[in-house]
């Protein structure tokens, strides 16, 4: 029992040391922005969690339409889960086909179960990570998701939707994400609407690229960019 406690203490100590290596960002003061809505909205994460790498990039489809597309790195990350899980399931099933057919036990299907979990996780990330994120001046709206405004009877059915005139500003904020063995900053780009509601656009770990994309989007929309990452 003592060795387990020592191991737990070591892991906790290691995590604290890793966290100490991450620079602590200054707290942003919204009063530095002379705008009443900036004082009213939240400056905490709109979408908890994130990624340590760049998951999306802004692409100009034409002069009146911009889209955030998943990066090659993000697609490969999702595919690793799908491919690894598929290989594990096929390899184990092929190697143990005889025992699987003659006797059914939890130990026999456990590796296959874990393989399917990897496939499902990869499929889940692919489905949501590659969903369209569109700013369209033709339709005068923004939407994020598999369903666009033309596919629903009422746009109120869409969770992540806004008409472009309702967009008041863009917001960049940071979030310190901690896992068991690692910690990193992820950065959100959010829309701020005229009613104070926020909609998350993208959330990833490359602040330099996010700022460039946000500035391009700010110019495209003609809306101010509020950058809270100090």
Where are these regions (language model features)?
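Short, solvent-exposed secondary-structure boundary motifs
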Residues: 33-52, 116-127
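Conserved beta-hairpin
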Residues: 68, 121-163
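Short, solvent-exposed coil/turn segments at beta-strand boundaries
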Residues: 59-66, 137-139, 195-196
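Non-transmembrane, membrane-adjacent beta-strand/coil modules in membrane-associated proteins
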Residues: 3-6, 26-39, 49-54, 58, ...
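Intrinsically disordered, low-complexity segments enriched in polar/charged residues with Gly/Pro
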Residues: 44-46, 111-112, 119-122, 129, ...
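Cytosol-facing regions at membranes
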Residues: 2-45, 63-65, 69, 230
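Alpha-helical transmembrane spans
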Residues: 2-6, 15, 63-134, 199
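Cytosol-/stroma-facing membrane-proximal "stalk/adaptor" domains immediately downstream
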Residues: 206-230
């Amino acid at each position: 029992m003592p060795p387990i406690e020592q191991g737990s203490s070591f892991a906790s100590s290691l995590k604290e040391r890793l966290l100490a290596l991450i620079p602590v960002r200054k707290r942003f003061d919204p009063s530095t922005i002379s705008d009443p809505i900036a004082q009213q909205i939240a400056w905490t994460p709109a979408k908890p969690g994130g990624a340590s790498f760049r998951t999306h990039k802004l692409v100009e489809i034409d002069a009146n339409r911009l889209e955030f597309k998943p990066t090659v790195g993000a697609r490969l990350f999702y595919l690793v889960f799908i491919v690894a899980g598929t290989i594990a399931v096929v390899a184990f099933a092929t190697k143990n086909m005889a025992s699987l057919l003659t006797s059914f036990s939890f130990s026999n299907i456990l590796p296959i179960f874990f393989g399917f979990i990897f496939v499902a996780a990869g499929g889940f990330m692919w489905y949501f990570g590659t969903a369209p994120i569109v700013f369209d001046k033709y339709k005068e709206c923004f939407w994020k998701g598999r369903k666009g405004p033309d596919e629903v009877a009422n746009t109120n059915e869409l969770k992540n939707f806004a008409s472009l005139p309702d967009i008041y500003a863009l917001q960049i904020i940071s979030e310190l994400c901690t896992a068991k063995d690692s910690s990193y900053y992820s950065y959100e780009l959010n829309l701020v609407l005229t009613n104070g509601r926020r909609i998350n656009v993208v959330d990833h770990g490359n602040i330099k690229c996010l700022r460039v994309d946000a500035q391009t989007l700010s110019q495209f929309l003609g809306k101010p960019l509020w950058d809270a990452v100090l």
